[in-house]
Amino acid sequence: MVEADRPGKLFIGGLNTETNEKALEAVFGKYGRIVEVLLMKDRETNKSRGFAFVTFESPADAKDAARDMNGKSLDGKAIKVEQATKPSFESGRRGPPPPPRSRGPPRGLRGGRGGSGGTRGPPSRGGHMDDGGYSMNFNMSSSRGPLPVKRGPPPRSGGPPPKRSAPSGPVRSSSGMGGRAPVSRGRDSYGGPPRREPLPSRRDVYLSPRDDGYSTKDSYSSRDYPSSRDTRDYAPPPRDYTYRDYGHSSSRDDYPSRGYSDRDGYGRDRDYSDHPSGGSYRDSYESYGNSRSAPPTRGPPPSYGGSSRYDDYSSSRDGYGGSRDSYSSSRSDLYSSGRDRVGRQERGLPPSMERGYPPPRDSYSSSSRGAPRGGGRGGSRSDRGGGRSRY
C-alpha cells in the first residue's frame, strides 16, 4: 500500500517543536536544491507538530540527505528522515467495506425453508399451497422423505389428526389445507402407518407429495396443474388411499370423516377452500384433488374448470364421496364408489344435500356447509352421505 509520494520528497519526523522551516532548509539545503519545505503545524496554535516534508529538486539529492540525516540530532532531537509516502488512508482506504453482504441469501433460504415449514401447517391456505408447494417441493424433492416423515409421523403422533379432528370445519379450512396436509398426513398416520410402512416410499412420496401430496399435489396441481399428473398419481393413489383408506376404511371411516376429511380434507379443504378460500385454489386443489380422487379423467378438466371443479368436486367429492362411501362401504365400494363416484357424481350431485349434511358429513357438512357452493357439493356430499347410506 505504501507508495512514494513523489521522488525527491522526504519525510522528516521527530523534530523539536522549536525547529522551523528556515532551520530545516539550512540543514537539508547542503544536500541539494530544495524545492519546498513544509513544516506541519497545529492549526490552532500554529506550533510545529514535530514533522515536516522537504522536497528536493533531484531525487538523488533526497536519497543522500535521507541516508545522512536519518537518526541525526537536530536542535537536540534525533530526527527520522525517509522517503515520503502517500498517506496510507488515501491509498488503502477504499478496500474493506464490501464483505458484510453475504448474509442475505441464507436468510432468504432460511426464510423460504422456514417459511415453507411454517406455512406448512397453519397457513394452510396460502401456506398450503406453498405448503404444498413447499411441501411438495420440500417433500417431494428433498424433503419429501424427511418432511413426509415429519409429516407422517406427526400425524401419527396424532398432532395432525387433532388438527384434523379438532379443527373441524373452519379450522380445517385453515387447517384444511393444512388439514389436508395433515389430513393426508393423518392418512398417513392412520392409514398410513399400516400402509405407510409398505407404501412409505410410495406413500410418503406420494403422500408426501401426496400427503403433502395432497397439499402438495394440490399445490402441484394447483401449481403445476399436473392435475392430470396429479390426477394420475393421485387418482391412483387416492385409490390407493381409497383402498388404503378403505382398507383402513373402518378406521378411516373415522378417518373417513377424516379420511373424508382427508379427502374432505380435500373435500373439506375443498370446501374450505370453498368457504375459506373461496375454494379457488382449493377448488383447484380440490379439483385436482377431485380430479385426483375422482376419476382421473375428470381430473384434468376439473383442474381448473370451476364448474368442473364443482363437478369435480362433486365428482371428486363424489369421488371422495364415493371414496368416502367407499370408505364407508368398503374397498369394493371403493370400486363401486369409483364407479359410483362417477355415477354418483352424476346422481350424487343433486341428491340430498340434507343428507349430505348428515353427521358423517358433518365434516363434510362443515365442508359442505362451508361449501354451500353447489348442490353439487352438498349433493355430492350427500351422495357421499347417500353413498354412504347406499353403501
From Swiss-Prot:
Residue positions where N-acetylmethionine is found in the record: 1
GO terms for cellular component: catalytic step 2 spliceosome; euchromatin; extracellular exosome; extracellular space; membrane; nucleoplasm; nucleus; protein-containing complex
Any GO BP annotation: negative regulation of mRNA splicing, via spliceosome
Positions bearing N-acetylvaline: 2
Primary location class: nucleus
Subcellular location: Nucleus
Regions crossing the membrane: none
Compositional bias per record (Pro residues), positions renumbered to this chain: 151-164
Crosslink (Glycyl lysine isopeptide (Lys-Gly) (interchain with G-Cter in SUMO2)) position: 22, 80, 86
Leader sequence segment: none
Positions of the UniProt region annotated as Disordered: 61-391
Function as written in the Swiss-Prot or TrEMBL entry: RNA-binding protein that plays several role in the regulation of pre- and post-transcriptional processes. Implicated in tissue-specific regulation of gene transcription and alternative splicing of several pre-mRNAs. Binds to and stimulates transcription from the tumor suppressor TXNIP gene promoter; may thus be involved in tumor suppression. When associated with SAFB, binds to and stimulates transcription from the SREBF1 promoter. Associates with nascent mRNAs transcribed by RNA polymerase II. Component of the supraspliceosome complex that regulates pre-mRNA alternative splice site selection.
Domain comment quoted from the record: The RRM domain is necessary for RNA-binding, but not for splice site selection, indicating that its splicing activity does not require direct binding to RNA.
The protein, known as: RNA-binding motif protein, X chromosome
Gene transcribed to yield this protein: RBMX
